[in-house]
Amino acid sequence: MNEMNGENVQTANHTSEVMRRFNQAFQRHEPEALTELVAEDCIIENTQPAPNGSRHVGRQACLAVWQGLAGESGTHFEPEEVFVSGDRAIIRWRYFWGAGERNSVRGVNLMRVRGGQIIEAMGYVKSSS
């Protein structure tokens, strides 16, 4: 394996670990676990409103969005698949706010990690309209 491939593998391993911890924070309702995972220059393009979603810039703004969601009682988050390539990840998920699929939405997050922290997240959901 050449040096570049080794660096890519190491980067992917770091990205995988950040995604594991990120998903775990939502599954366990541990919003405080997100604090060290979000970079100062993080940007979220949220799922709503259409067509572009709301934009949240900076660590505190991104933490407010994600910690609010992770701490919401009566909900649960199920990652269906996580794909990592270098510093990028795709999370396919389902979010439940009640019992059964009627009370859920499926979506995808496109993530980017740098230095062990999330710097970019773009969210997309399947709409009922």
Each predicted region: which residue ranges?
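Proteins with a high burden of low-complexity, intrinsically disordered sequence enriched in S/T/G/P/A and R
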Residues: 12-15, 49-50, 129
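Small-side-chain structural scaffolding
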Residues: 25-33, 42, 89-90, 107, ...
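Alpha-helix C-capping/helix-to-loop hinge sites
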Residues: 22-25, 45, 76, 96-97
